[in-house]
From Swiss-Prot:
Bidirectionally degrades single-stranded DNA into large acid-insoluble oligonucleotides, which are then degraded further into small acid-soluble oligonucleotides. One of its GO terms (molecular function) is exodeoxyribonuclease VII activity. Heterooligomer composed of large and small subunits. Its EC number is 3.1.11.6. It comes from the Bacteria. InterPro entries: Exonuc_VII_L, Exonuc_VII_lsu_C, OB-fold_nuc-bd_dom. Belongs to the XseA family. The keyword Lyase does not apply. It comes from Leptospira borgpetersenii serovar Hardjo-bovis (strain JB197). GO terms for biological process: DNA catabolic process. GO terms for cellular component: cytoplasm; exodeoxyribonuclease VII complex. This is Exodeoxyribonuclease 7 large subunit. Gene3D superfamilies: 2.40.50.1010. It catalyses: Exonucleolytic cleavage in either 5'- to 3'- or 3'- to 5'-direction to yield nucleoside 5'-phosphates.
Length: 422
């Protein structure tokens, strides 16, 4: 074994190719999966990867085969089944499926999940244009959330420095793909939002990549971090697809990191020109204000108050004195009128008191008279009342009969009597 001649890479590759091409299990087979990394060359050939939950396989759909395809346009995320033969590309040492037919099975699970999340966030108002902030025209400090080793960071810094050399740049490094990317991007954005850094605008993103490479920017946590950023944020992910949810949540989105830097950072000459124009406008406005103030001063200086200020003051003092005298008279008149009314009221009260006293005396007099003439009072003076058995008052002897029993009412009580004689 140790003395056997070592094989070259090409020899090993040819052996593998013979094994693959000689296997009936890899010829004219149907393979089902989800399209990713889709691209179409100028030659008309279509290249894409077919994947499932754990594996990825490269596919080539040559123009002489795909010209017969009449289904919906192929794109990343679509679930399809393809018919073809597995081959091995010797120069690259990788296997490939040469596709003869493609049948679309429906939209891929990933795109469906993204669409559901998009609808959910849209219903919450995350993508509403009204909540987007204006990107500052003249930022002092630019914050960048991206990979520290990618081409994106170099492009952003290069463009920013070339446009405005004096701008402050603060980098918050993060992963931009893989399982750790979502939490890392969120942490980077939150760090740049800390008030102590004084960041005016944030660029968050990465350079181009495959559909899978960009999936972190469709993660719900990342999208919400874009939307919740206290500082205006620019999405800067290099892509040609329209399904990146972070683009919708950002205050402004650009197709590349370079474009984001150009939008966020003004040119120094433009800033100087703006300041020069602003200085001119301020100077013009100030001169106009001074001229207007001079005209007003000239107009006011010709008025009476400035010519004879003491005379005007004397007139005002005289007017105050006149008003004081009138006010004093009015007060005195009011007091005098109130005094007269009070005297009239007191006189009326005295008269009413006298009338009441006389009326009371008269009432007491007649009350005494009435009481003196009442039957009980009369009987106290020696009088009596005579009644027959039926209770009728007897006023003369003719109203009684001999031997008739009668009742006598006296002051102290009653007694029974019998008439005697005729």
């Amino acid at each position: 074994m140790e003395d056997s001649k070592p094989l070259t890479v090409s020899e090993v590759t040819r052996i593998l190719k013979n094994l693959i091409t000689g296997s009936k299990d890899l010829k004219n087979i149907w393979v089902r999966g989800e399209i990713s990394n889709y691209s179409k060359a100028s030659s008309g050939h279509i290249y894409f990867s077919l994947k499932d939950s754990s594996s990825l396989m490269r596919c080539t759909f040559f123009n002489y085969s795909n010209k017969n395809y009449s289904g919906k346009p192929l794109s990343d995320g679509k679930e399809v089944q393809v018919y073809g033969t597995v081959t091995l590309y010797e120069a690259g040492g990788s296997y490939n499926l040469n596709v003869a037919r493609v049948e679309e099975l429906g939209q891929g699970d990933i795109l469906l999940q993204i669409e559901k999340l998009k609808q959910k966030l849209a219903a919450e108002g995350i993508f509403d244009p009204e909540r987007k902030r204006r990107i500052p025209s003249f930022p002092k400090t630019l914050g960048i959330a991206t990979s520290p080793s990618g081409a994106a960071i170099e492009d952003i810094i290069k463009i920013a420095r070339s446009r405005f050399p004096g701008i402050n740049i603060l980098i918050s490094p993060c992963f931009v793909q893989g399982d750790e990317a979502p939490d890392s991007i969120v942490a980077a954005i939150e760090e740049l939002n800390h008030p102590s850094w004084g960041v005016d605008v944030i660029i968050a993103g990465r350079g181009g990549g495959s559909f899978e490479d960009l999936m972190a920017f469709n993660d719900e946590k990342v999208v919400r971090a874009y939307a919740n950023s206290r500082i205006p944020i620019i999405s800067a992910v290099g892509h040609q697809t329209d399904v990146l949810l972070s683009d919708f949540a950002a205050d402004y989105s650009t197709p590349t990191p370079t474009a984001a830097a150009e939008y966020a950072v003004p040119k120094e000459e433009d800033v100087l020109q703006f300041l020069t124009q602003l200085e001119g406008r301020l100077k013009t406005s100030l001169l106009a204000k001074i001229s207007s103030s001079k005209d007003r001063l000239r107009l006011l200086s010709g008025k009476f108050i400035f010519k004879e200020p003491m005379q005007l003051l004397n007139q005002r003092n005289q007017r105050v004195d006149e008003i004081g005298v009138r006010l004093q008279k009015a007060v005195f008149n009011k007091v005098g009128l109130a005094r007269v009314r009070l005297e009239r009221y007191e006189d009326l009260t005295s008269r009413m008191r006298n009338i009441f006293f006389h009326k009371k005396q008269k009432a007491e007099f007649w009350t005494t008279k009435v009481e003196d003439l009442s039957p009980p009072a009369t009987m106290k003076r020696g009088y009596s009342i005579l009644r027959n058995q039926k209770g009728k008052i007897i006023r003369s002897p003719e109203e009684t009969k001999p031997e008739e029993e009668l009742q006598v009412l006296l002051s102290g009580g009653t007694m029974q009597v019998i008439r005697k004689g005729k």
